[in-house]
Design a protein with these regions (language model features):
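Structured, solvent-exposed acidic/aromatic patches
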Residues: 1-180
């Protein structure tokens, strides 16, 4: 949890940031929560690197540079403030990244009739013109076992469990630092 970016991002707590592997796995030094500003800077850095490294769009079942750009647009929108107190620089960056995705001509809004059956379509079907990225989970592809990743997010026809929670161990680690 973190406060909105426009509410003192330097002072409010964000999430713990760990870059790289610890040298000593037996004696971990648990990181404190970083500031909201540092958290957003890390997210932006990661997404810009992803945009640089990812390929063009192939299918919604694969992350692409357009998925990174769509997320960059969303992050900058969150940073752009409120209607009464906007940050025009971040609003412009949000617009620029969203426009990159729109102008790519890789995506289009679904018709009303197609949208009404959206959840019945395979994530990588040609008719999925509106989806930029989706975790692929098709129950028939996995028989009784479910998709290792997709089943965590969706429960379809009795397959999967559709729940993702932070583990008790993770929550305990967060509380150990005393800065939550």
């Amino acid at each position: 949890f973190g406060r909105p970016y426009y509410q003192e991002p330097e002072k409010n707590l964000g999430v713990p940031i760990v870059n790289g592997m610890p040298e000593d796995m037996d004696n971990l030094d648990l990181p404190d929560r970083s500031s909201v500003k540092d958290t957003y800077e890390q997210v932006l850095s990661d997404l810009k690197k992803a945009e640089e490294l990812m390929s063009d769009f192939k299918s919604p079942a694969y992350a692409s540079k357009y998925a990174a750009q769509a997320l960059l647009a969303k992050v900058y929108m969150y940073m752009s403030g409120t209607f009464e107190n906007p940050n025009k620089e971040y609003a412009q960056l949000s617009y620029n990244y969203a426009n990159e995705v729109i102008e790519s001509n890789q995506f289009s809004l679904l018709s009303r009739s197609t949208f009404m059956t959206y959840n019945e379509l395979a994530p990588d079907a040609a008719s999925q013109t509106e989806t930029i990225f989706a975790v692929k989970f098709i129950a028939s592809d996995w028989d009784d076992w479910g998709s290792p990743l997709g089943s965590m997010y969706a429960e379809i026809d009795g397959q999967g469990w559709g729940e993702v929670y932070a583990s008790a161990k993770y929550m305990d680690l967060l509380h150990e630092t005393g800065k939550n």
